[in-house]
Amino acid sequence: MYDLHSILIQLKKEDTPLHGVMVRCVRCFYQWLDPTLWEGSALFELWAQELELIYGDLRQRLSPNAKTDAGSLGDRFGFDTPPELPRLLQSIQTFYSVLIKLIAWNTLRGATPEPPLTELLSGRAFVNRGIRNFCGDDWYIWPLDIWDPALETQCEELRACLEAFDTCPEGSTLSPDSLSRIYETVVPPALRHALGEYYTPGWLAERTLQNAVSASRQQAGDLRFLDPACGSGVFLIQALRMIRADTPQGPPLSDQVAGFDLHPLAVLTAKVNYLAVMARQPLPEAGLFLPIYRYDALNIPILRGDTLVIDTGCGLVCDVPLSLCRQAVEMRPDPEEFLSMPEARGLLTSLPPNGRLLLAGILLNRIWAFFHQKADIVMGNPPWVNWEYLSPRYRAGSQHLWGEYGLLQVKGPRLGFSKED
């Protein structure tokens, strides 16, 4: 198993082999994310829509007025001229996605031969090991659509470099903070803080859950937990550990702990943390389905008769027959299987094949989360984002909640903190 502490140290130090590999990967990805290759494509427009949903006005948040210095960020990755920040962000996040999948495979590979890198990055290698809903088509597997020799070389260099860190004995415990710290190292603080990204320390999640379980007057092993804004999964991991401590021989833990998040990288990180806990014991013969979903808990699907109206968050709203939703919940298909179902063949037909698979994955996650069983304890550290940084579309879609829950009852001096709308 990889020594994540040593990985973290090398990523921070500029004169180390791993830091050099990171810089070369990010620059290579940046080169291939040339807007002339992508702008105008349906997939690019969908990505831009979701980016706005997650971060609001990205150009405003990454502007000099927001104290984000493109020059100093470019220096870190060896750029001669200041890079375009949204493009740099996508390059950095793509690198993190590749890194985290390599770490995930290392936690469970055992005696299994190393799969081709294309199978690992696409998620097929994990499906072949019986692990479902880990990863698939997302905004960060775009290199597979090109798979130029330069891209392949950089990704293989990263995999080879990580082998030097495979020093921890089998069964070692993965700290729930480790992956968050790696993300915080890969994505420079200036970018993270401009985007409002902060993570909850493990000790705080543990203390919070202990208090919640104590107040419930039940054992953790008898409860179901949900984190509707799970981030990197720190609350999920603490809940899994509490359940296992209470019921060492109990039912599969994945039936009891679930998480939602809007950010695809947060979801991926949470799944790696979740998988690391589950992989410490033999996986069920039927395989393992990871109940962590790309889902916006404030923008839930709407039931209209026999149809579930789902906002994908990418500018597309889909009317999905309720009967198809029930099949998806029962069968848990992958995106390709889902689109082959008779009732799904008319969905997303305006998109290119890779776009259809990506959006089908988003639809499935919305469906699975919407029909997920009720929880006894809702846990987590809710995201905090300034109102003016939310996209206009998100403000309009969620504004009714503030009145319904009495959140606009502000009087006196506190009116100075209110916004124009």
Regions found by a protein language model. Give the residues of each.
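Alpha-helical structural motif
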Residues: 3, 18-21, 25, 43, ...
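SAM-dependent methyltransferase catalytic region
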Residues: 170, 178, 184, 188-421
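N-terminal secretory/membrane-targeting helices
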Residues: 1, 138-146, 315, 323
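Intrinsically disordered, low-complexity terminal regions enriched in charged/polar residues
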Residues: 1-41
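Class I S-adenosyl-L-methionine
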Residues: 26, 30, 40-48, 52-67, ...
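Solvent-exposed, charged interface segments at domain starts and junctions
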Residues: 23-34, 46, 90-93, 300-319
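Short linear interaction motifs
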Residues: 73-89, 354-365
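Non-transmembrane, amphipathic alpha-helical segments
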Residues: 10, 39, 43, 87-91, ...
